[in-house]
Amino acid sequence: MSPWTPQVFTPCPDHPDVLLGRVAARSAAFEGTSAAGGARVIVGSAAGHEREQVARSARGELLERVGNVMAGRAAEAAAETVATHGELRRRGLAALAPPGLPDSRRLWVRGRTVAGAETYVAAGAVFLQHRPPPGCDTLPSTGSTGIAAHPDAASAARHAAWEVLERDLVRRSWYGLTDRAPRMLDAGPAGPLGALIEDRGLTASAFALPAPPGAECVVVALHRPDGTGQTFGARCGPPGDVAALVEKAAYEALMVRWSMHTVTARGAWEEWRGETPPTTAVQHALWAYYRQDSLSLWDVARTQARDRADPVDRTGQPDRADPVDRTDRTAPAGRAGPPRSNRPADPLAVLAGHTGQDVILVETSTKSVRSAGVRVVRVIAPGALPLPSGHVPGPGRSRPHPFG
């Protein structure tokens, strides 16, 4: 078994066709993460009902993150271009203006627009767990949204573009920044996952977010019939096969649900108890699961969900050990309709049209990752923002978002 071989297992033995895959790498080059209880570990995970696909997806997620971090360490050691944004512009170099503190000294790396123009990008916007070289200001680094690994760079870029668009559409909808409400879908996952959801007495609430032409973005929440215990997943892709997007989003929500019963999540909840706004991915997921009726806040709660005047569940009591819950009654999920269209969509073009700005690509493939047969690409789309952490003051919905 190679270091990149995931463990594929069944979270519910009575539903052996529903699979989770996980694989981890440890290194002093990594920073501690909340998902690993502070350990210097990077994890790749996936869910599905085809063993080879689950293993491939979990391995790909690990490789994209490891490749990105290690490419960052190489760039940090070389420290080839350290400057302020203004200094780069005075040298006649195209550079993406960083948000906030434009006069800060940073490490910069080369990227290219989709059209091929060279553009410098701040390393903190490219690399996970960025460690600024000496002489640079210490600033927050970016998250994993917008990194993908595939056998070829073009496929990796397309995958990452869908991911960037997905998170921006979720952000805009959750914080009330769109002029349209989410559209409820009479659709739920079928097949092995649908059977598991029905057997566990859970409800799958699926809805579509406002999306630009050429894209469809769906969110799925798994929860008990009374609306408690919510976990979320989302997926963005080309229009025409909503059923596939719903299934992928539902599997993501299932992974989050399973993770709520891990030692790391239980320990985090016992220590934190939701007494302050969430600041990490794990805390956001715990907040949605134990404390917040996010479906009601999003104005998309199904009639099966309990109508509560107070949108916060203050009990905060962990469930039984069943990794995806079991209740006394069932709530069959709906079934997705037929595909609407098979028209191909270029996610890079859709993303550029959505933001009105050039999309920038930075390859972060290391030698070890290339030897594993993949290329890693970071997609940066000015104007498309990731989900923030914690409370966001201002107009619209200010409660913490429910995505871990």
Language-model features, listed with the residues they occupy:
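Helix-biased "structured C-terminal domain" signature
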Residues: M1-G316, D328-G404
